[in-house]
Each structure stands twice: as C-alpha cells, then as structure tokens.
Amino acid sequence: MSTVQTPVQYLPAKTANSIKLVDEAQAKTNLLGMTQAQLADYFKSIGEKPFRSTQVIKWIYQQGVTDFEQMTNLSKSLRDKLSANACVIPPKVIHRQYSDDGTRKWVFEVTGGSLVETVLIPADDSKLNGRKTLCISSQVGCALDCSFCSTGKQGFERDLTAAEILGQLWVANASYMSDENDSLENIDHSLWENNVTNVVMMGMGEPLLNYRPVVSSMELMLSDHAYGLSKRRVTLSTSGVVPKMYELAKELDVALAISLHAPNDELRNELVPINKKYPLEQLMAAARNYVFDVNPRHKKHVTIEYVMLDGVNDSNEHAEQLVALLGDLPSKINLIPFNPFPHANYDKSSNNRIHAFSNILSEAGFVCTIRQTRGDDIDAACGQLVGQVADRTRRSAAWQQSIKDRENS
C-alpha cells in the first residue's frame, strides 16, 4: 500500500522540462480552462492570430506542456509575450493518497486557500490501459445540503473556475507521467499520455449551479484539440436543477446522471431538499426532454443514482415506486451503498437488502448495477478527505500560533 500523508511541494520551473505551478505575478492570465473560442479571443486581444489557440490547446492538453518556451511551433516573440503576460497553472496539490487497487485521491488548494477533492478510480479488470474514471469537483462545498452527504455538511464557499475544474483532470493525467513521489517536475512531455478515459462531474458541489465554468470545462474534455473524450465518457451528475437541465440539453451533448435517492416527493424532500423547489414531476420531465431529443439517431439514457440507506429508502415498496416513477425513461440505475461519515444519521443497507432491491428493478426490465467500493485502504465519502486535511491544517496552524504566542510572552 502507498498511502502518502506528506503534502506534496511544487516548486517554480527551473529547467526546460519542469512544470511551472507558481503564479509569479498574479496579474497574469491563466490560459488553463479557456475554450478554443475564449483562447482565440485572448490571442486577438494581444495582437496575435486566433489560430494560435489551436496550437496552444494541443500543447497544454495533448502534450502536458505548461512552459511556453517548450511550445516550439510558436515564434520566439510570441513565446516571450506569453511568458510575460500569461501562465498555465493547475490547482496546487496539498495532499494525495494512492490505494493498492489503483484508486487515487487528491486534495487541491484553490485560490483563497479553500480545499477540494478529486478521486480517480480505475476499472477492476487488471488491464494496464483499462478504464480510468476521474470524479471531479465543481464547487468548494455545496449549498444543497443533502442529508446523507458529507460535502453538504461542510457548507458552501464558492464556485470553482474553469481552470480549477479542468486542472483536476490535468493533474490526474500528469500523475501517471511522474515518479513514485508524485513530483510533477521534470516530466518528459514526449512520452505524455492522457490516461484518464472517463470523467464524471460527481465530486464536491452541484455542477449545474456553476453552469458556465462546468460547460466550458466539458467542451475542452470533448474537443479533439484537447482531450478528445467521447461524449458518452463525460458525465454530468445533478441533484435536479431543472432549468439548467433544459439549458444543457440545448448546448452540450454529454451523459446525464440524476442523484435521485428517493422514489417519492415526501421522502426526497427530506433527503434532497432541492426537491422542494423542483419536485419529481418536473425533474422527470426535464430528464425525458434530455433523452428524447429531435435526432432519432441519438440513443441516450439517464443514469439514476440511488444511495441505499438502511430502513429509509430501501424497502420493496420503494423499489416498486421507483419502477413506476421511471416508467419508459431510458435509464440505468446505479445503487450506491451508503458510505458513513462522522455524525451521519444513516446506516448502510445490508447486502441482502441491496440485492433484493436490485432484483425488483431488474425484473421490471431496468439495467441495475451495484456500485463496488474501491480504495478501501483510503476510503472516505466524498468530501471527507477534504475535511480531514482541513482539520489537520487548522490544528497545525493553531499549534504554530501557540508556539509564537509563547515565544512572545
């Protein structure tokens, strides 16, 4: 097992192959997370041709290059101009843990000192180049306060920028290019590969409440000039921000997941409070609109996420209600064993209960899966690792302050 507790230190670039992760003059424009259109506008604003955006995007995302001096198909004068006025800076990793089964977790410090968490889960198929799914955060904390969610109990601080969102994917790919100490310096960019095959916007926060930065980030994930991921390999999960679901359906074609967790309004109002604003009838209508678009060649489905809470939402009656609720909606149901966290008011459903629930759904004709727990040796519900690191940071700061106080007394 490799579970690392020591914060990873990132240093300024000093060599041609090192990665600059320090913003020397915070007035510089961070190009990370800019869409091709945004980057083209930036180049026009500095008196350059907009086609440079394609070149720079390829360097950043297909080669992992953040040092403009290494972008050799740019003129020397343009490289100098970019070095003076721009930067490519992902969020800073302050903590990471790697599991025996390949699961990786990072805690990032974003602007202002806030912390967000990212998790990478490899497929359990023993393939060296198999599926690797990255769970990305979109906000610092979450305002929805779902009663079973650790992140919601930490409150909401702010939205993440596109650079902070896409930077999580950039660092996850970079981690496969680095040594066992997870240093991101001295990477041979000629060997760069984008190992992450799937992205799910299921980390901290509600993605549709941070709509524009999230959509911009997903555009780059799909772009052939950047990550080139298939639209079925990029999934946005929402608790049900209905107006934005309609907006997303018009703007971007990615896979949709709904954090449902209850088959009736009374129970969902308790578990997922946003249901009081957008009840199930409205949510299901928005889901059907997303799936049944005007192009008959688009064969879409919605993934229904359903956390299994002992004695709360896991009865046979609840399963039958779920069957009736979904009706003819093309959907795959993912049952999620509850992952307890400190002071949680719920328990995990038994394995027998989960399988009985699953059988009812399967017999009704739905594809139903049970999420497998991964990374047991570094296990934590979404948001818990951030809480643990933040607690340690606060304790360390308090201890250091007590030393200073004693020295000054």
Curated annotation (Swiss-Prot):
It is found in: Cytoplasm. CDD domains: Radical_SAM (cd01335). It catalyses: adenosine(2503) in 23S rRNA + 2 reduced [2Fe-2S]-[ferredoxin] + 2 S-adenosyl-L-methionine = 2-methyladenosine(2503) in 23S rRNA + 5'-deoxyadenosine + L-methionine + 2 oxidized [2Fe-2S]-[ferredoxin] + S-adenosyl-L-homocysteine; adenosine(37) in tRNA + 2 reduced [2Fe-2S]-[ferredoxin] + 2 S-adenosyl-L-methionine = 2-methyladenosine(37) in tRNA + 5'-deoxyadenosine + L-methionine + 2 oxidized [2Fe-2S]-[ferredoxin] + S-adenosyl-L-homocysteine. It holds the Pfam family RlmN_N. The active site is at 117 (proton acceptor), 382 (s-methylcysteine intermediate). Residues 128-377 form the Radical SAM core domain. Reaction proceeds by a ping-pong mechanism involving intermediate methylation of a conserved cysteine residue. Specifically methylates position 2 of adenine 2503 in 23S rRNA and position 2 of adenine 37 in tRNAs. m2A2503 modification seems to play a crucial role in the proofreading step occurring at the peptidyl transferase center and thus would serve to optimize ribosomal fidelity. This is Dual-specificity RNA methyltransferase RlmN. The gene is rlmN.
